[in-house]
Each structure stands twice: as C-alpha cells, then as structure tokens.
C-alpha cells in the first residue's frame, strides 16, 4: 500500500498519440494522477469532463493532469476527441502503473466478484513524492475537491 510522503512509483506509458510519457517527465511540477475504470462509461465520462472544465485552474497552478486506465490508445483518442479533453490520457493495458499504485482491486457488484480499477486520485508533489491519496473518489466532485485542496 502506498503512503503519503513516499516516492511515487515511476511509469512509462503511451499517451493517446502513442508518445511515451513518464512520471519523471514532470519533476518540478505538481501532478494530479487519476486512475479510472473505463473510457466512455457514465462515471468516467463525468469525471473526465469535470477535469476538462477545471483544466484552466490546474494550468494556472502549474499542475499537470494525467488520467490512466487500461483502455487502448485508440479508445483514448476517441474519448479525448469526443469530449475535447485537454489533459494527458495514458494507456495501461498491462496494468503496469495500475498495479504499482495499488488500484487494481477486488470489486463486488450485485454479489458478483471481479477485479478492476478502483477510482483513485493521487497528488504528486514537485519532487515526485505522494502528497495526497484520494481513494474511491466521486467522479462529479473529484476535480473541484483537488482545486480546493490546492488553494489551501
């Protein structure tokens, strides 16, 4: 289990254009790293659109927003285009970052047990350390909660 104050696990994953993006690319900037289950599903779409609506606020605070799911690059391209998402989406089909951040967990729905991404957001400081962990966030309010936290 990751803890506040520890080094955030490094990753290198493709973005929606196939470019490899690493967490270390953003040393010197704060990073909002949000893990979500699936492109184009109701909760994930609301969460992404809320981040898009708040994007200028993140930029004004020199904060990079990165969304990660196990969806394909093509899925991310379509998702970003459909909803005009201005931030980085990374594809993690091999669960590299998803597992290293501990968000691939058992889920229960109507008595059925499966594994999937538990919607979780990490705020990573300018030195690459975990500053805040927000587990099981609400998709509609996650972006606003982070902006409030950053403004404190």
Enumerate the language-model features and the residues they cover.
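Chalcogenol-based redox active-site neighborhoods
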Residues: 1-152
């Amino acid at each position: 289990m990751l803890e506040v104050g520890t080094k955030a696990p490094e990753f290198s994953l493709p973005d929606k254009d196939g470019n490899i993006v690493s967490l270390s690319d953003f040393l010197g900037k704060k990073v909002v790293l949000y893990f979500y289950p699936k492109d184009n599903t109701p909760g994930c779409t609301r969460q992404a659109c809320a981040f898009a609506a708040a994007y200028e606020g993140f930029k004004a605070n020199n904060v990079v927003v990165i969304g990660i799911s196990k969806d394909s690059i093509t899925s991310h391209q379509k998702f970003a285009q459909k909803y005009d998402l201005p931030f980085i989406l990374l594809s993690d089909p091999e669960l590299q970052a998803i597992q290293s951040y501990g968000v691939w967990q058992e889920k229960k729905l109507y008595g059925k047990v499966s594994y999937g991404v538990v919607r979780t957001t990490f705020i990573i400081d300018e030195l690459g350390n975990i500053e805040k962990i927000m587990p099981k966030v609400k998709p509609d309010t996650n972006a606003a909660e982070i902006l409030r936290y950053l403004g404190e």
